[in-house]
């Protein structure tokens, strides 16, 4: 199951300083538009590299990522769906 590998990679790449900055940037405080969003602290270019690494991931696993509590896992799922759409035959 690739999903366990994806999650492990993301946890290894997590950066507390970036996560703290992202929480402020995305306004995650009480009553703010991003209230409760949880960040691992991984920049978008790094996530794009993971899209390439996990090109063979199933739609079911991508769907599970979409329901993650972590912002970066959800974003990774969206980036994976975009890649699947681009590589589709129609």
What residue spans do the PLM features occupy?
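Alpha-helical scaffold domains
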Residues: 1-90
């Amino acid at each position: 199951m690739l999903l366990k590998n994806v999650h492990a990679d993301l946890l290894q790449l997590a950066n507390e300083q970036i996560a703290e900055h992202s929480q402020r940037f995305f306004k995650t405080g009480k009553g703010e538009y991003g209230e409760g969003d949880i960040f691992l602290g991984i920049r978008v270019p790094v996530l794009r590299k993971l899209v390439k690494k996990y090109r063979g991931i199933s739609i079911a696993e991508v769907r599970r990522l979409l329901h993650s509590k972590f912002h970066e896992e959800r974003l990774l799922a969206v980036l994976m769906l975009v890649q699947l759409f681009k590589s589709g035959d129609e």
